[in-house]
């Protein structure tokens, strides 16, 4: 379960050095401190090491760093391997991996631990099945949500053939009982059917509390497996899952995730508990292999929020956005148009009330949308989720809250996503966009409608962050109705932006809008010829900067004959050409 070093053989300084390998700064503490908030109850450091029965114990993922430390100090290490690696089981993999999946699986099998980062739709579950069959040890698949248990069970039953050599359970009279343990067991979701061969469990169901002390404990069955696969392993920093992984003596521990980065900064804990990142699948390569064009449509709302005050919190801004009638009408119109064009839209909102309002507006427009929120009874919600595959040819719009459609939501025919409330974290965007990335017959293009509220600096900055993530995911960005124009509006990186930007300015036919935090004379000089050319053709040019320019920048503005305005309260950095091309 962990690496144990005898405490008696270590000096206090050596103990601190070794325990330091499993210790890192707590981002939450420093975040609160920088914002002058209370740090009560927030430790400065997060320590995953322990003192157990005369040993210093550190997570298995620290092995490489420990060996490096020992080499630097001239110490020779001797290992006693007490991990679980017996009870070999006859298993065969019944499927066939795609070439890119085979490469990923072979890379993982080189190591006894580690994380595979693969985007949604790559086939992490199938690769997990291949790892289980290849290793042939009792396996435990740990998932964060019960919805994933069903997915894993169906895939494992489909792809793995397991030879069951267990003695049959007999009745008190010696007859073979009709109730035999399952081949593939389930722990969680209201069931406790343990197989001992291959089991799937939610991590919440693997731990409990000591009846006498109240201390958290792990169920004994965790110690019976030679292989552990932690699906959506970015949850490994959760206290319950951390406890489970630190108590499991399995020889092999693998983590699978589309987003191994954590928004709270606890990413280091993942590599300590599951091992380092061993294989990463590039989302751009996945898009090429799938042959599915990825497009993002920025929808500039142009709204103003009279009640907005500088310094308002994100939740306060979100309240104003969700209540804005014109913005909601824009979202509803886009969803209806997508559905009428034969697409399958999914509208996601952070707020339950907002989702309900969009649902109502869609119904008022004569559509029959599907609503999924946490308010719906669990039984009814399950029935709705099970019925969704039947609506493929009806093109009904699904309206849901982000929190409800977390890991485990799988509807491969979805091809259009409308992000009704702003997000910025890379992992959230990747997860939401991943709803569209599953392969499906006839799927050739997926689209994301991104609603951009430039009037609020915080939301403008969030949009800039989203653009970077879209670029990493292989998306093209365009606003024009004609999809054939998408190629001309591809996301550009910093290595060749200037030539393309100048070309877009020269080819402008209506107007150019530029907003920047400051004006640089060097940058203005590089854009001087193209801006002057557009202005002489009668193209409207509006430039807004957030700080007064220096004299050299003022001179370039004067030479071009272009006016600018200063808005100190804004920090927007964007260029919009002809209300279509976005920088």
Where are the predicted features?
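Post-DEXD/H (motif II) to motif III coupling segment of the RecA-like Helicase ATP-binding lobe
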Residues: 226-227, 234-297, 470
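Conserved interdomain hinge at the start of the Helicase C-terminal
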Residues: 309-350, 356-361
């Amino acid at each position: 379960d962990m690496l144990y070093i005898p405490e008696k053989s270590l000096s206090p300084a050596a103990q601190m050095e070794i325990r330091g390998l499993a210790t890192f700064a707590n981002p939450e503490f420093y975040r609160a401190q920088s914002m002058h908030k209370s740090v009560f109850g927030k430790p400065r450091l997060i320590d995953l090491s322990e003192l157990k029965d005369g040993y210093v114990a550190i997570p298995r993922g620290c092995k490489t760093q420990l060996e490096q430390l020992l080499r630097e100090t001239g110490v020779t290490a001797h290992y006693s391997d007490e991990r679980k690696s017996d009870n070999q089981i006859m298993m065969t993999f019944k499927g066939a991996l795609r070439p890119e999946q085979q490469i990923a699986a072979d890379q993982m099998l080189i190591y006894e631990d580690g994380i595979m980062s693969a985007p949604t739709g790559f086939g992490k579950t199938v690769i997990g099945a291949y790892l289980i069959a290849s290793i042939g040890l009792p396996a435990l698949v740990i998932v964060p949500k019960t919805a994933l248990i069903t997915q894993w069970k169906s895939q494992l039953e489909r792809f793995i053939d397991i030879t069951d050599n267990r003695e049959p359970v007999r009745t008190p009279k010696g007859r073979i009982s009709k109730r035999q343990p399952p081949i593939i067991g389930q722990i969680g979701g209201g069931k406790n059917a343990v197989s001992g061969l291959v089991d799937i469990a939610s991590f919440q169901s693997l731990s409990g509390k000591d009846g006498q002390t109240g201390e958290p404990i792990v169920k004994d069955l965790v110690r019976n497996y030679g292989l552990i696969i932690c699906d959506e392993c970015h949850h490994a920093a959760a206290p319950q899952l951390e406890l489970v992984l630190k108590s499991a003596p399995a020889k092999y521990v693998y983590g699978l995730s589309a987003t191994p980065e954590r928004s709270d900064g606890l990413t280091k804990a993942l590599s300590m508990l599951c091992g380092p990142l061993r294989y990463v699948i590039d989302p751009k390569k996945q898009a090429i292999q799938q042959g599915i064009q990825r497009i993002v449509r920025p929808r500039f709302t142009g709204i103003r929020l009279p009640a907005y005050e500088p310094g308002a919190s994100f939740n306060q801004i979100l309240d104003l956005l969700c209540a804005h009638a014109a913005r909601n009408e824009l979202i509803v119109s886009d969803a209806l148009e997508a559905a009428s064009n034969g697409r399958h839209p999914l509208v996601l909102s952070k707020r339950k009330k907002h989702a309900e309002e969009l649902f109502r507006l869609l119904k008022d427009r004569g559509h029959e949308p599907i609503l999924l929120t946490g308010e719906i009874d669990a039984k009814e919600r399950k029935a709705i989720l099970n019925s969704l595959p039947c609506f493929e040819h009806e093109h009904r719009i699904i309206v849901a809250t982000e929190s409800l459609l977390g890991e485990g939501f799988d509807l491969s025919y979805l091809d259009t996503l409308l992000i009704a409330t702003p997000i910025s974290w890379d992992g959230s965007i990747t997860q939401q966009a991943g709803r569209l990335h599953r392969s499906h017959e006839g799927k050739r293009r997926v689209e994301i409608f991104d609603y951009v509220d430039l009037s609020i600096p915080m939301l403008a900055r969030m949009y800039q962050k989203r653009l970077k993530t879209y670029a990493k995911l292989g998306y093209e960005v365009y606003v024009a109705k004609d999809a054939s124009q998408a190629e001309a509006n591809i996301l550009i990186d910093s290595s060749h932006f200037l030539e393309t930007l100048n070309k877009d300015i020269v080819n402008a036919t209506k107007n150019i809008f530029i907003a920047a935090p400051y004006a640089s004379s060097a940058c203005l000089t590089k854009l001087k010829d193209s801006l002057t050319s557009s202005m002489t053709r009668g193209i409207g040019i509006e430039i807004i900067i957030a700080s007064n320019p220096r004299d050299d920048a003022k001179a370039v503005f004067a030479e071009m004959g272009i006016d600018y305005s200063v808005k100190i309260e804004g920090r927007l950095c964007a260029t919009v050409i002809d209300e279509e091309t976005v920088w």
